[in-house]
C-alpha cells in the first residue's frame, strides 16, 4: 500500500461540555495559526484525542499511561520501562518524554486510520 505524503498531523481540540481554562483557548489559537501557515506548504491532517484512544487502546476511556503501555506493547514488547530501556541499552522509545509520546500517538493514529481507510477502499465490494 502506498501512502500519499502527509507532512503534518495535528491533534484537534474537542468539546466535551466541560468548563475549560484559558490554556485550551490558547491551544486552539495556536492550532489555527499553525494550520493556516502549514496548509500553504503541506498536506495537513487532523486527529482527535478520542480517535487516538480508540485506535491505540480500543477504548475512549484510556489515559496517557494506558496509551504509553499500548504503544510499548506494540513497538517494544518485553523491553523494560515502557520500551525506553537504559542509557547503556536504549530501547525503541529511548529519550521519549511527555510531549514526544503524545506526538507519536498522533502519528500512529493517523497511520492506522489511513491504513484502515485504504484497506476498506481496496476491498470495497469484495465478498458482496
Locate predicted features:
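Phosphate- and other anionic-substrate recognition elements at nucleic-acid/protein interfaces
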Residues: 1-128
Amino acid at each position: 500500500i502506498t501512502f500519499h505524503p502527509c507532512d503534518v498531523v495535528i491533534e484537534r481540540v474537542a468539546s466535551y461540555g466541560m468548563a475549560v481554562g484559558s490554556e485550551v483557548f490558547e491551544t486552539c489559537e495556536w492550532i489555527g495559526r499553525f494550520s493556516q501557515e502549514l496548509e500553504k506548504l503541506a498536506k495537513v491532517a487532523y486527529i482527535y484525542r478520542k480517535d487516538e484512544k480508540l485506535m491505540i487502546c480500543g477504548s475512549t476511556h484510556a489515559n496517557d499511561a494506558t496509551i504509553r503501555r499500548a504503544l510499548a506493547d506494540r513497538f517494544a514488547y518485553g523491553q523494560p520501562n515502557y520500551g525506553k530501556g537504559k542509557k547503556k541499552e536504549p530501547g525503541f522509545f529511548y529519550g521519549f518524554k511527555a510531549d514526544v509520546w503524545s506526538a507519536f500517538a498522533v502519528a500512529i493514529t493517523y497511520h492506522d486510520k489511513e491504513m484502515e481507510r485504504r484497506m476498506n477502499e481496496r476491498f470495497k465490494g469484495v465478498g458482496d
